[in-house]
């Protein structure tokens, strides 16, 4: 049972990308985007804990999601926009552009990142921050795109992640 209003379960549908069955992720994502979010009193299932419900919708509507918080990797889902751009530092932009996207065309046929074919449903945060174009061609029927995924290596960024410095404890104020 999938309960979208229970935020800890939001990543469940993306497990299919890791099991080399990304068409199932695309199908479920489509069902949630169009079935559980809409304009109306019940158009947002569950509660909006710190913006997680909205963040899930916005990222997936653009066609990707950060499956594992803290890991600099995005998994590709089912975009609903024809084109959307994210403004980045240093006048860069990351644009997601779809080809043949429609309500019926919910499956991914092929993906290119800056003109280079992606054969797995993953890209890194580093790639997003470099800017460029993620082009997603859609299909009305499930495809074999992304079925040769080897996500273990994709978890590692090109550069090591810098550890966060520990926060110094705050000393309590003395009563005057």
Language-model segments: residues:
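Beta-rich accessory regions
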Residues: 38, 68-162, 171-176
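Active-site core of glycosidic bond-cleaving carbohydrate-active enzymes
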Residues: 1-95, 100, 126, 133
């Amino acid at each position: 049972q999938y309960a979208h209003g229970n935020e800890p379960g939001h990543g469940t549908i993306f497990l299919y990308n890791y099991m080399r069955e990304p068409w199932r992720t695309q199908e479920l994502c489509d069902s949630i985007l169009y079935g559980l979010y809409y304009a109306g009193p019940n158009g947002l299932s569950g509660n909006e804990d710190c913006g997680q419900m909205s963040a899930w919708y916005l990222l997936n509507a653009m066609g990707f999601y950060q499956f594992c918080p803290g890991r600099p990797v995005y998994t590709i889902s089912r975009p609903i926009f024809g084109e959307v751009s994210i403004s980045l530092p240093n006048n860069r932009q990351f644009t997601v552009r779809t080809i043949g996207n429609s309500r019926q065309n919910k499956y991914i046929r092929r993906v290119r990142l800056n003109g280079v074919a992606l054969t797995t449903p993953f890209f890194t945060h580093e790639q997003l921050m470099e800017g460029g174009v993620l082009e997603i061609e859609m299909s009305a029927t499930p495809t074999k795109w992304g079925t040769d995924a080897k996500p273990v290596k994709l978890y590692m960024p090109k550069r090591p992640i810098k550890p966060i410095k520990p926060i110094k404890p705050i000393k309590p104020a003395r009563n005057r």
